[in-house]
Amino acid sequence: MLHFIVNLNFRINTYKMKKFKIEFKWAVIMSIIFLAWMTLEKQLGFHDEKIKWQMFFTMLIIFPNFLLYYLALNDKKKNYYNGEMNWKQGFISGVVISFIVVIFSPITQFITHEFITPNYFDKLIALSVESKRLTLEEAKSYFNLTAYIWQSISGGLSFGIVIGAIVAYILKPKTTNSTIKSN
């Protein structure tokens, strides 16, 4: 009997994992692109001599992220929903991607700040204090790995949900079809 229960639980979990396989794939791709973007920022000097412009350059990641969400939800539409995905299904897929990206965000932040640009926080703290925008204590409390992990979690979740909703709207069918497979 125990074997049957364990086997049934495995089948249910396997089904759930297959249901979100596409979202997981795209969340991994998005995390890798984030690390590549951080490497690009570092190589272009936005973590060193151009650090005062880094915030503006970082905002440009919205364009590749929007494209990635579009590709991800289009993949879900074509390969899971057979070309017919309504807004709700696309939105749920976008939310799932956002949650998975958020789960990866502590790891990507750690890699970024320990390996790609280990002196980043020191430079931001120095810039903030020199420009008299923050006191040393304020800068240290704002520019550290823990704070950036929390910022990436909240920002990634809110950004992902909004972009997922927009992309789901773009990809929804032009006419309402009541035969679309629902979740």
Question: Where do the protein language model's features map onto the residues?
Answer:
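Membrane-helix interface/capping segments
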Residues: Y70-Q89
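Alpha-helical membrane-inserting segments
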Residues: I33-L44, L68-K76, F104-T112, V162-I170
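Ordered, amphipathic secondary-structure segments that act as subunit-interaction surfaces
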Residues: G83, G90-I111, F115
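Hydrophobic alpha-helical transmembrane segments
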Residues: T135-I161
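Alpha-helical transmembrane spans of integral membrane proteins, capturing the lipid-embedded, hydrophobic core
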Residues: E23, A27-L35, I62-F66, G94-S98, ...
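Short, charged juxtamembrane terminal tails flanking transmembrane helices
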Residues: K19-F20, L171-N183
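Functional transmembrane-helix hotspots
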Residues: I107-S131
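Transmembrane alpha-helical insertion/packing segments
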Residues: L2-I5, R11-Y70
